[in-house]
Each structure stands twice: as structure tokens, then as C-alpha cells.
Amino acid sequence: MMESIKKLREMTGAGMMDVKKALADAEGNEDKAIALLRERGIAKAVKKGDREAKEGIVRFAVDGNRAAMVEVNSETDFVARNADFQATVEKLAQAALQAKTNDVEEFKNFTVDGETVGNMVAATAGKIGENIVLNRVAYLEGQQVAGYVHSNGKIGVLVDLAGGDEAKAKDVALHVAAERPQFLTRDEVESGDIEKEREILTNKALAEGKPQQIVEKIVEGQIGKFYQERVLPEQTFVKDNSLTVAKYLGDASVNKFVRFEIGA
């Protein structure tokens, strides 16, 4: 129980007694407790992925209209900053360009200079003396491809644009790193998630004493905001808050994006 209270407090920003009551009302179900906290106006919206954190780094490699990215986890940040560890991850990013796969297990069996990727990771772990895990790999082939890694190496992004130029692709990659979009279009959002959000917002508005006749308008406005916070083209552009990403791109558009974040 105490572990759940601690976790939900960190995730929602709610007080201990509020979290404890919500968990009791939800019979220990954490997701239901979060929904109750939101309905009661106590908790902010919680994004999926705001959970446990791991150490490690993300690296990418680009070759013309192709790009690849890897996430490799370590037990400690000290090792994540180790030169041998970083050199291995850089080599893995280059290898991922050749492997052309989004499947980690397939990538582990890919051979580089006579050695499998899996063995390369194991050898580095043995040398450093810490468990190292190849967690994710991404490969992208498109029209206008760019990558971005945040200065601390914890966040990496690949982007492919239809139209536009390299500068715009890099700007969008930086935006994706900073603003964490979850979807490329509204159609990608599960209808069940929207209905759940609508129910929470409706219950919250009614609990606040809002008149029934205006609750629907309030909720639809908030659903619009829900999309604007999560759907990439609808987000406010990070480098110019007078524009959405779609308006910044003009005639160009995003074909695909991939975002890795350590621990997410």
C-alpha cells in the first residue's frame, strides 16, 4: 500500500491523504485511483511512461535518407558516461544502419566485423563490470530524414519529412524531444482513451458544480486540448509559440517520428 501511495504521489502531485483515499475507493487499483484523483480535481493528467527511470544513453546515425537509433541501458549513470560504453553505443548505432531492423532480438544476431551485436554488448558489460542491456532499436528510411539527441544523451529522436529541408527536419526532431508527442494523427488515438478522458472531464466538471447545459462544451474544449498536447502537428511549436508544428512546416509534413527516452 505504501509503495502505491508513494508512486501515485510522484505521478500525480497529489497529497498523501488524497492518494490514500483514492486508492481505498479504487480498491487498490492504481489506474482507477488516478482517474478518481483527476475527477476530484486533485491530480494533473498523467502521461504513460512517467514511471521507473533507468540509466543509459541514446545514439543515432544518419546516412542520406536513412537513419537508425539505439537505446542502451546501464545500471548507473557513472557507466553511462564511461568512454568505452559510449563508444560501444556509437558503434551499435552505425551497425543499426546496416541491420535495417526495428526488432531488438533480430539486431542482437546481426554480425559486425565478425561479432554479433549481442556478443558486443556482452563483451562491453564484462569489461565495465556492470549489466548492460540493448533495450531498443529503430530504423527509418524516407525522404528528408534527421536525428537529434539531447545533450545529456537521455533522449533521442528520428524524424522523416515529406517535403521541407534538413533544417526543418532537425527543428521538428528537437521539438519532438522537448514536447513528447505521442501520436502523428488524431486517428492514432484509441477511441477508448478519448471516451475515458471525456468521462473523467465530465465528472470533474459536474463535481465542480458546472451547469449541465455547458458541461458538454467545456469537455469538448478540453478534449481539443487533449489532442493539442499529444498529436504532433497540432502541438505548439517549441521554437515559436505563435505557430503549431503544422503551420511551421507549411507545405511539408511529417511521415514518421520515433522518440526514445531512457526510462520511458
Swiss-Prot record:
HAMAP family: EF_Ts. Residues 76-79 are annotated as: Involved in Mg(2+) ion dislocation from EF-Tu. Coiled coil: none annotated. Its main location: cytoplasm. CDD domains: UBA_EF-Ts. The keyword Transport does not apply. It holds the Pfam family EF_TS. InterPro entries: EF-Ts_dimer_sf, Transl_elong_EFTs/EF1B, Transl_elong_EFTs/EF1B_dimer, Transl_elong_Ts_CS, UBA-like_sf. This is Elongation factor Ts. The keyword S-adenosyl-L-methionine does not apply. Keywords: Cytoplasm, Elongation factor, Protein biosynthesis. GO terms for biological process: translational elongation. GO terms for cellular component: cytoplasm.
